[in-house]
């Protein structure tokens, strides 16, 4: 479950960042110059979020921060879905980046608590392998979907990944809490 969570998270992060500008141009009619600038805002959200997360981590636990991040991603995806003005999508991608910020570091940080310090190094290695598998497979898969179906499906694709992440993370937390 933790491996699928990592796979889904990294797939969501990279698919969001790689396909944002194409989505804005092809689905929202934004100029390429504006779209590329707005897509880079995803990374501003991610960077800002990581800085904020560093301070929040002193006060809140990893589970809370992961859930908070996933909730923020959900809000961002909902904004990308809003069809009225491209500004909603711009803001949505920034918010998705902001929400992504705590997830990766907090999952890594909570691994020793979930699996024990003696197993955590091996578990983190496998988590990273699944993370890179998500990085390498899902953005090209969305490329096929965009090419053969519609690039307008980007928010739905991201939502499916988010549901997968939430389901796997919550199931893992429940299992470990009950042990």
What are these regions (language model features)?
Residues 49-61, 146-147:
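Helix-to-loop junctions at the C-terminal end of transmembrane segments
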Residues 7, 40-44, 71, 125-133:
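Transmembrane alpha-helical cores of Major Facilitator Superfamily
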Residues 76, 87-95:
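Paired small-residue
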Residues 1-40, 47:
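Extracytoplasmic gate region of multi-pass secondary transporters
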Residues 157-179:
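Multi-pass alpha-helical transporter architecture, strongest
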Residues 64-78:
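Structural signature of the two symmetry-related core transmembrane helices
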Residues 117-151:
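A late C-terminal transmembrane helix in Major Facilitator Superfamily
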Residues 102-115:
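Intracellular juxtamembrane helix-capping segments at the cytosolic ends
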């Amino acid at each position: 479950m933790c491996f699928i969570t990592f796979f889904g998270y990294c797939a969501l992060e990279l698919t969001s960042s790689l396909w944002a500008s194409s989505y804005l141009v092809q689905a929202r009619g934004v100029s390429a110059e504006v779209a590329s600038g707005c897509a880079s805002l995803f990374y501003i959200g991610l960077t800002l979020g990581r800085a904020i997360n560093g301070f929040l981590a002193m006060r809140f636990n990893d589970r809370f921060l992961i859930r908070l991040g996933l909730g923020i991603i959900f809000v961002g995806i909902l904004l990308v879905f809003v069809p009225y003005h491209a500004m909603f999508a711009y803001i949505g991608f920034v918010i998705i980046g902001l929400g992504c910020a705590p997830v990766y570091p907090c999952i890594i940080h909570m691994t020793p608590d979930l699996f024990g310090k003696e197993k955590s190094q091996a578990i983190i290695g496998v988590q990273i392998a699944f993370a890179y598998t998500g990085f390498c497979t899902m953005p090209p898969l969305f490329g096929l979907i965009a090419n053969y179906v519609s690039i307008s499906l980007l928010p739905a694709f991201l939502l499916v990944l988010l549901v997968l992440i939430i389901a796997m993370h919550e199931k893992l937390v429940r299992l470990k809490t009950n042990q």
